[in-house]
From Swiss-Prot:
Membrane topology classification: Multi-pass membrane protein
Keywords: Cell inner membrane, Cell membrane, Membrane, Transmembrane, Transmembrane helix
Upper lineage: Bacteria, Pseudomonadati, Pseudomonadota, Alphaproteobacteria, Sphingomonadales
UniProt keyword Membrane, yes or no: yes
InterPro entries referenced in this protein's UniProt entry, alphabetically: UPF0060
Compartment annotation: Cell inner membrane
Transmembrane residue ranges: 4-24, 30-50, 60-80, 87-107
Protein name: UPF0060 membrane protein Sala_0701
Family affiliation: Belongs to the UPF0060 family.
Pfam families: UPF0060
Transmembrane helix keyword on record: yes
Length: 107
């Protein structure tokens, strides 16, 4: 469930933020904000589904997933292919997220 929650949250957050970007930077209608706000609310809800004891740890691990998802958005939606530095950076971030998620926790 955690992986699905993180991936869904990332897509919802990016879509919500992109709606504001489209309105303010691409001269789209202000009505783009309506689904953007709904998407951002969905993002916040989905993070509550992550199985973790502390919100801060959930958000920290989510950061790596968000970065990778943002690069996929860059490629799939905006049509700009990530370069090797983007991919190396995303791999480092996902590695950090994995350490946060799966690292052994002492009592």
């Amino acid at each position: 469930m955690t992986a699905f929650a993180y991936i869904g949250a990332a897509l919802a957050e990016i879509a919500g933020c992109f709606a504001f970007w489209a309105w303010l930077r691409m001269d789209k209608s202000v009505w783009w904000v309506v689904p953007g706000i709904a998407s951002l609310a969905l993002f916040a809800y989905l993070l509550t589904l992550v199985e973790a004891d502390h919100a801060g740890r959930t958000y920290a691990a989510y950061g790596g997933v968000y970065i990778a998802a943002a690069l996929l958005w860059l490629w799939a939606v905006e049509g700009a292919k990530p370069d090797r530095w983007d991919l190396i950076g995303a791999a480092v971030c996902l590695g950090g997220a994995a350490i946060i998620l799966f690292g052994p926790r002492g009592g």
